[in-house]
A protein has these predicted regions:
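A short, well-structured edge-of-sheet supersecondary motif
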Residues: 38-68, 290-293
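Peripheral terminal and inter-domain segments
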Residues: 328-429
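Catalytic-site signature segments of enzymes, centered on catalytic residues
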Residues: 134-218
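Active-site SXXK
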Residues: 57, 74-103, 127, 173-177, ...
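Bacterial N-terminal signal peptides
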Residues: 1-8
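Active-site helix/loop module of the DD-peptidase/beta-lactamase fold
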Residues: 75, 94-132, 181-216
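Active-site Gly/Thr loop motif
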Residues: 247-296
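Active-site-proximal alpha-helical segments within enzyme catalytic domains
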Residues: 172-176, 216-237, 281-298, 311
């Protein structure tokens, strides 16, 4: 295979709506913001996609290392869960739902023939706190299209006792919200939060059952993540309007079991709370500093490393609210913010092995991407990789030599792909 750097992105134009300020105007030294950015960019096995730092509701620093840009949407993985937690609170406020409601009562037609006492006792709160009593089955969604029925058919231990992190529990919450509101989770959030907050750059993956996946699958811009983080920081208030009940935000951000609230995590830094997604997606909410930090990335190291950089490089410099004098450090920050870029993939630009595979169909083993075969077309400045999916869909991915190339993939949510690659080798029969 031709190996290159491949970033999954989705572009949508909606940026720079939050007010901007200098770090010094909000009581933060530019030097500390630069130190955070430099430290994050230097992490091994990590590609930073974006970092946005806010204080007092204003953006005081942001980076989008090339080829990333503010208008790109990012795949949020489990950061999606916190939005589901908010939707549950909204449904409760609308008198459509109770924490004590039994999960099985929403899906009587999907219950097993024999309903155990533990299944009958499982509540909405148990799903919120990851204490459903069902052992997580991370492969279930790849083996069946009947997710709700399969989940309810599994053995259930005593609910409410043991924390077992499970994205399907959050999917069940999405299904419940859809059941009681008559609209998908995404449409409900659009009505209640996204439209008032002018978050229009959002999409959410859909299950075979026609339900937003809930526990994963949200695609959203970094600035919109920052807006949502501010909403939580301000206890549900947005531009003077109470969009999300303050009491519910408090419950979401309060320890319910272990280090978990309602679809959110408590942090190592005292009082800080976070949204947390695979491969290093974070929204850090830091009440004592009146700050929000958004990080999107692809990292293969322990995510606690990134959080420690925020705690140790940035926060110690935030000692008060008095404005500081902006000088050379701010000018340096301005220059660096626009200069960050992801590293170039190393390797050769060509190989004698290319001819063996060029313009030929390469059949693939079954894989999670649903790719059936590839064709590699080597051009002067790029490689065109034609992908054929098992359903017959075809599209091209472009890999540039010493430059980024963009291609789009049709579907929902839509993707843009930017890639830069060099020849590292071909492996095959």
């Amino acid at each position: 295979m031709f190996l290159g750097l491949l970033g999954a992105l989705a572009a949508h134009a909606q940026i720079n709506e939050l007010p901007r300020s200098t770090p010094e105007a909000e009581g933060v030294p530019s030097k500390a913001v630069t130190a955070l950015f430099d430290s994050l960019m230097a992490l091994p096995k990590t590609d930073i996609h974006s970092v946005v730092v806010l204080r007092h509701g204003k953006v005081i620093g942001e980076i989008y290392p090339a080829p990333f840009a503010p208008e790109y949407r990012h795949t949020m993985y489990s950061c999606s869960k916190t939005f589901v937690g908010a939707a549950v609170g909204l449904a409760i406020a609308d008198n459509r739902l109770l924490l004590t409601d039994r999960v099985g009562t929403f899906f009587p037609e999907l219950l097993p023939d024999s309903v155990s006492a533990n299944l009958a006792d499982m509540t909405v709160r148990d799903l919120l706190t990851m204490t459903s009593g069902i052992t997580p089955d991370w492969n279930m969604r790849n083996l069946t299209s009947d997710w709700i029925r399969t989940f309810l058919a599994k053995p259930v231990k005593t609910p409410g006792k043991k924390f077992e992190y499970d994205s399907i529990s959050t999917y069940m919450l999405s299904a419940i919200v859809q059941k009681v509101t008559g609209m998908t989770l995404l449409d409900y959030l659009k009505q209640k939060l996204f439209t008032p907050m002018h978050i229009t750059d959002v999409a959410w993956e859909i299950s075979p059952e026609g339900i937003n996946t809930g526990g994963w699958g949200l695609h959203i811009q970094s600035e919109s993540l920052a807006k949502f983080g501010l909403l939580l920081l301000n206890r549900g208030v947005w531009e003077g309007r109470q969009l999300l009940p303050a009491s519910w935000v408090e419950q979401m951000m309060t320890r319910q079991i272990g280090d978990y609230g309602y679809q959110m995590w408590l942090c190592e830094y005292p009082g800080a709370i976070r949204m947390d997604g695979a491969l290093g997606q974070y929204v850090l909410i830091i009440p004592d500093k009146d700050m929000v930090v958004v990080i999107t990335e692809c990292t293969l190291i322990d995510g606690a490393t990134q959080r420690r950089l925020v705690w140790n490089r940035l926060l110690p410099a935030v000692t008060g609210d008095q404005p500081l004098i902006a000088g050379k450090d701010y000018k340096r920050l301005q220059k660096k913010q626009s200069s960050y870029q992801l590293p170039v993939v190393q390797g050769k630009a060509s190989s004698s092995l290319v001819g063996k595979y060029a313009d030929k169909s390469i059949m693939l083993e079954p894989n999670k991407f649903g790719w059936q075969s590839l064709e590699l077309h080597f051009k002067q400045k790029e490689v065109i990789m034609t992908v054929t999916e098992t359903n017959g869909t075809k599209y091209d991915l472009l890999f540039g030599y010493k430059q980024w190339k963009k291609a789009s993939i049709e579907g929902y949510p839509p993707y843009s792909i930017e890639a830069k690659g060099r020849f590292n080798g071909i492996e095959g029969p």
